């Protein structure tokens, strides 16, 4: 069994049981955003966390061990995404990426926003013209160093 197969089993079981990521996260004791990323194979769980996830998704000990292995993060295909929702993020970075870069550099200097020392919050924002998706990303600024 591979990590991808474990991820596929998690997703299939989630659908079959009608589970919500927020409910799973509450049982694990972490945010819904981080827990979802972990269950989709992008983060590493502790033994205790893997045990909780394993119980929820009826994973064997061998399958739970895959959840504790450091994954190849960002392992989506390198081609332009075809899923409409993921494509919109690709499009967002294509359109606003240079703006993000300019404004971050203007505010902080030459460096990057960490995706390691990072947190994200996704919420529904009621709006008269139709509900909106509100995503807040917070990453530590890491300046480039001279040497």
Curated annotation (Swiss-Prot):
It is an enzyme of class 4 (lyase). InterPro entries: Cyanase, Cyanate_lyase_C, Cyanate_lyase_C_sf, CYNS_N, Lambda_DNA-bd_dom_sf. Pfam families: Cyanate_lyase, CYNS_N. It comes from the Bacteria. Its EC number is 4.2.1.104. CDD domains: Cyanase_C. The active site is at 88, 91, 114. One of its GO terms (molecular function) is cyanate hydratase activity. It catalyses: cyanate + hydrogencarbonate + 3 H(+) = NH4(+) + 2 CO2. GO terms for biological process: cyanate metabolic process. Keywords: Lyase. Catalyzes the reaction of cyanate with bicarbonate to produce ammonia and carbon dioxide. Belongs to the cyanase family. This is Cyanate hydratase. It comes from Methylibium petroleiphilum (strain ATCC BAA-1232 / LMG 22953 / PM1). The gene is cynS.
């Amino acid at each position: 069994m591979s990590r991808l197969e474990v991820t596929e089993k998690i997703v299939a079981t989630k659908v079959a049981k009608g589970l919500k990521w927020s409910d799973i996260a509450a049982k694990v004791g972490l945010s819904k955003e981080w827990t979802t990323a972990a269950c989709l194979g992008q983060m590493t769980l502790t033994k205790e966390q893997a045990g909780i996830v394993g119980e929820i998704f009826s994973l064997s000990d061998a399958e739970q061990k895959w959840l504790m292995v450091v994954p190849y993060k960002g392992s989506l295909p390198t081609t332009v995404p075809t899923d409409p929702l993921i494509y919109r993020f690709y499009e967002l970075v294509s359109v606003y990426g240079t703006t993000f870069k300019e404004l971050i550099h203007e505010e902080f200097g030459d460096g990057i926003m960490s995706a390691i020392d990072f947190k994200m919050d996704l919420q529904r924002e009621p709006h008269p013209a139709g509900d909106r998706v509100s995503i807040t990303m917070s990453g530590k600024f890491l300046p480039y160093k001279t040497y």
